[in-house]
Swiss-Prot record:
Gene behind this protein: aroA
Catalyses which reaction(s): 3-phosphoshikimate + phosphoenolpyruvate = 5-O-(1-carboxyvinyl)-3-phosphoshikimate + phosphate
GO biological process, one term: aromatic amino acid family biosynthetic process
PROSITE patterns linked: EPSP_SYNTHASE_1, EPSP_SYNTHASE_2
Organism phylogeny: Bacteria, Pseudomonadati, Elusimicrobiota, Endomicrobiia, Endomicrobiales
Record Gene3D superfamilies: Enolpyruvate transferase domain
UniProt function note: Catalyzes the transfer of the enolpyruvyl moiety of phosphoenolpyruvate (PEP) to the 5-hydroxyl of shikimate-3-phosphate (S3P) to produce enolpyruvyl shikimate-3-phosphate and inorganic phosphate.
Keyword Cytoplasm: yes
Protein name: 3-phosphoshikimate 1-carboxyvinyltransferase
InterPro entries (UniProt xref): Enolpyruvate_Tfrase_dom, Enolpyruvate_Tfrase_sf, EPSP_synthase, EPSP_synthase_CS, RNA3'P_cycl/enolpyr_Trfase_a/b
Family recorded in the similarity comment: Belongs to the EPSP synthase family.
Major site of localization recorded for this protein: cytoplasm
Source species: Endomicrobium trichonymphae
């Protein structure tokens, strides 16, 4: 499937973006392990999150959907054993499902095989295999790739683990496994990554301590069912923040967006660049800070992003590159090598497609150099999404300032995180 898009005069309106993908995954997982009935309100019904829901249904958890909410009858920390010797779980394109679920399955007394689509089957899994194996799980893989064959044990061994990367998926897998350990499990990372798991574990009654980049989780006897409301996803809002900033005369309000301080790197750096962004109606919902984001067209200046900021905006970097093409001066992004092992090699994907659009951009092993110019319009052409939802949405926003017509190949992949993206985009274009 491909879509044809054209330059717009300006964007305006009041919109909401889909619920947070990261929080939805975690809410489904912990609700499934809790005792009692949990409600996950305003969950994200995307392809990725549906994989997590189906995985737990397959393992005997009763999950009903009604009017945009999930009603989860928790099975407790011990999931039902498979009737035919092992579970076969298909994770689709979802790295979150695969890695976080691995931590839970490591503490179950049965065998599970996890497979995925072609893209997921190329993504590195050693980062979770190694620590979970140290805790006592028996995990086999295809040379560090899917399929994973996980034979869990209970209890697992406590672990003191220091990661050389700041990745919330690895951290969460270890913390979830720590629920089933025989003692305290501690995780240390170079820079604090998104902390949705820590916040939610605490909400479900888990004894967890956070001290800077250290997190310690203690074994759990049970999780307590919760009523959770999932806020809008800042990573989805980022595309419309970009649209309002780079299309002249634009003024856009995005309501009910989660602005967790471990996810607000994009907003911080954009304000440093001169962006007119206001966070209004700040409040807290289900342990997460939420607000309405008001964005107006702004003349921007270039900025530098390094490894200390990347974990707080890793998913937003592709669309940040687009913004940087419209910021006066040279923007440098480093410390973002993790982009090479996402749904596509996002460093290569972004660089190759923005060169097609006429941008002055060079790739680095761990980032980009962008020579931006606020007076420069991109040139529409045929571009590839590489079946990567964030690349497709970035290119769609780029089309708003591209002369002529932009055709995006494999445009349907946006459904991974943002069903209805093109409809929302069409509604704000004037």
């Amino acid at each position: 499937m491909e879509i044809k898009l054209k330059k717009t005069n300006y964007v305006s309106g009041v919109i909401e973006v889909p619920s947070d993908k990261s929080i939805t995954h975690r809410a489904v997982m912990l609700s499934s392990l809790a005792e009692g009935n949990s409600i996950v309100r305003d969950y994200l019904p995307s392809d990725d999150c549906n994989r997590t829901i189906e995985a737990f249904r397959q393992m005997g958890v009763e999950i009903k959907i009604d009017n945009g909410s999930l009603y989860v009858k928790g099975a407790g920390l011990k999931l039902a054993k498979p009737q035919n010797g092992k579970y076969n779980i298909y994770a689709g394109n979802s790295g979150t499902t695969t890695r976080l679920l691995s931590g839970i399955l490591a503490g179950q007394d049965f065998e599970t095989v996890i497979t995925g689509d072609d893209s997921l089957s190329k993504r590195p899994m050693r980062r979770v295999i190694l620590p979970l194996s140290q805790m006592g799980a028996n995990i086999k893989s295809n040379d560090g790739l899917l399929p994973l064959i996980i034979k869990g044990r209970n209890p697992l061994k406590e672990l003191n683990y220091e990661s050389d990367k700041s990745t919330a998926q690895v951290k969460s897998a270890i913390l979830f496994a720590g629920l089933f350990a025989d003692g305290a499990t501690t995780y240390k990372e170079p820079v604090k990554s998104r902390d949705h798991s820590e916040r939610m574990l605490k909400a479900f009654g888990v004894n967890i301590k956070v001290n800077g980049n250290f997190v310690t989780v203690y074994p759990a006897e049970k999780l307590i069912a919760q009523d959770i409301t999932v806020p809008g996803d800042i990573s989805s809002a980022a595309f419309f923040i970009a649209a309002a900033l780079i299309v002249p005369d634009s003024n856009l309000t995005i309501r009910n967006v989660g602005v967790n301080p471990t996810r607000d790197g994009l907003i911080e750096v954009l304000k440093q660049m001169g962006a007119d962004i206001t966070l209004a109606n700040m409040r807290e919902i289900s342990q997460e800070p939420v607000c309405d984001i008001v964005v107006k067209y702004s003349k921007l200046k270039a900025a530098d992003i390094d490894a200390s900021l990347v974990p707080r905006m890793v998913d937003e970097i592709p669309v940040f590159v687009l913004i940087a093409t419209q910021a006066d001066g040279i923007t440098r992004i480093s410390g973002a090598k993790e982009l090479r092992v996402k749904e596509s090699d996002r460093i290569e994907s972004v660089t190759s497609q923005f060169k097609k659009l006429g941008a002055q951009i060079e790739s680095l092993e761990d980032g980009f150099i962008i020579n931006g110019n606020s007076k420069f319009n991109l040139a529409g052409t045929i571009v590839d999404s590489f079946d990567d939802h964030r690349i497709a949405m970035t290119l769609a926003i780029a089309s708003l300032i591209a002369e002529g017509e932009t055709i995006i190949r494999d445009s349907h992949c946006v459904d991974i995180s943002f069903p209805g993206f093109y409809k929302v985009l069409n509604n704000i274009c004037r």
